[in-house]
Amino acid sequence: PQPQPQYSQPQQPISQQQQQQQQQQQQQQQEQQILQQILQQQLIPCMDVVLQQHNIAHGRSQVLQQSTYQLLQELCCQHLWQIPEQSQCQAIHNVVHAIILHQQQQKQQQQPSSQFSFQQPLQQYPLGQGSFRPSQQNPQAQGSVQPQQLPQFEIRNLALQTLPAMCNVYIPPYCTIAPFGIFGTN
């Protein structure tokens, strides 16, 4: 039996390389998705702080108590401090993105029942001994605060003004011009 011609052999390693590259890409995508989910969940306090501070369209139209607001600020900052510096910009944009999604949901369902659909995120905060419960029985708060709908760039400016200063984190200048709604593509 003759040895096989040389030229057919190099094909094997190439396809393996391609497979490895594909696997790496898939892994990276999965990691980014997981990171994004974590960021979005952890940054709910940041979103609430920005919403609250600027009275942007808010599902819980009640104004938060001062103690709760301070707690949200602390939680938000703790999460921002844990995020590596190169991801902080992404984190702020995730907050902005979440606020924009939140506004869009608000627009779609402006019936009174939307009061309760946004109670969920509050339960996720690690608040200790159940000291805070969303004050659902607060009828006079409904409709008393007229939330404003803001365009994307204004929300982004507000978030960039509020969060880095509040938590004393450094956000690089290019962060202000990062694109919207396209996360994990670069």
From Swiss-Prot:
Repeat as a keyword of this entry, yes or no, is yes
Gene3D superfamilies to which the protein is assigned, alphabetical: Plant lipid-transfer and hydrophobic proteins (1.10.110.10)
Q: How is it modified after translation?
A: Substrate of transglutaminase.
Classification via Pfam families:
Gliadin
Which InterPro entries does this UniProt record tie to the protein?
Bifun_inhib/LTP/seed_sf, Bifunc_inhib/LTP/seed_store, Glia_glutenin
Would the keyword Repeat be found if you checked this record's keyword annotation? yes
Region (Disordered), start-end ranges = 1-20
Q: What does this protein do?
A: Gliadin is the major seed storage protein in wheat.
Protein name in the entry: Alpha/beta-gliadin clone PTO-A10
